[in-house]
Amino acid sequence: MNFPGRDEVWLAALDPVVGSEIRKTRPCLVISPDEANRALRTVIVAPMTTTERPYPTRVRVTFQATQGQVALDQIRAIDRTRLIRKLGKVSAKTAQTVSRTLVEMFTRE
């Protein structure tokens, strides 16, 4: 398997899940840095969804002509064996917006 890269979208099998975690096999955005992706067996991803919610932790995205959101409130580490195949890469603008939103989420004021 190729190492997943930051800002790439991979189809990932997220089941089994518990409670309110986003479930099923779906596109996920890789948000962990490339250095970690090469060194570890796990990857940090944010699931993508076509169900839009007005949450500040959701980033709008158009990927492969489908509109949806990157669910940064659902980020998780998954084993690379859950990754099924690479689907592509988000735009530079979307990648920047995701990075800015993550900084806002984890910065203390």
Predicted regions: what is each one?
Residues 1-109:
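Conserved functional hotspots at enzyme active or ligand-binding sites that engage polyanionic ligands
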